[in-house]
């Protein structure tokens, strides 16, 4: 995907080959090996880190970044949540009630849907918001964590119920919502992720209104796209007290322009060099800029060999 330093064919002696490499700047150097055996192709790769603790984001942070999102959330909160909850009796356990829920986000009729799991025993509980990776799918809810004594809310981001048959979501992924992460990315307020980020924050509003929530401990977690949303939510809502971001996506979009790995969805690698407006807009949706606003403890993970959410971008 990114600049190749050396590419060559080799013939192994005694089944071994030793390679040497170095870097002059902080980053990750990857070795990818392809072997052709008969009519099959085998691939393997290994990635080495060079002073990764010295990596700094390339993306620029708009001067009004935080102010912009504070105002957008204030505007969204003028729309009442109007929550709806339906008990899913077939999913309930001896200790947990499971609900299909929805609530309004940024305008009348625009809803987030999810699966809420609440311990049956009377009391006040901590809460965990689970935000999704990229794609369109149904959700079962995090019953396991609820059985350990926490409220859990697992949300979808596309404004559709999350308890339909898989074929329903497949049709959307292959049709109207195909490539949704690119929609209106040159429009600051109509970019697809605007509603998504606001929706994740309204999910926190929803949790905080639950009578069973203890008002003290509220976490958010997810992987890839969900890792990004975890950082974004924790950065913008002070009621979030901790987060866990698993290989977060949407990081350091501008890195591509400096020939450095950027995060999924690799806007400028796959979809062409940006015009001035697009570059301006995506800075407001860059996980790296949200991370600058974090003030609560978090747990991160990433994979050196990950070429979807490269570690350089995190």
Protein language model annotation of sequence segments:
Residues 258-314:
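The feature captures the conserved acid-bearing segment of alpha/beta-hydrolase catalytic domains
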Residues 137-198, 255-262:
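Cap/lid segment of the alpha/beta-hydrolase catalytic domain
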Residues 106, 113-124, 132-137, 143-146:
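Short beta-strand-to-loop junctions in surface cap/lid or active-site-entrance loops
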Residues 227-275:
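Hydrolase active-site cap/lid region
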Residues 6, 75-122:
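N-terminal cap/lid segment of alpha/beta-hydrolase-fold proteins
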Residues 1-56:
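Beta-strand-enriched, solvent-exposed domains that form extended recognition/catalytic surfaces
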Residues 50-84:
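Low-complexity, Pro/Ser/Thr- and charge-rich linker/hinge segments at domain boundaries
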Residues 213-223:
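Alpha/beta-hydrolase fold nucleophile elbow
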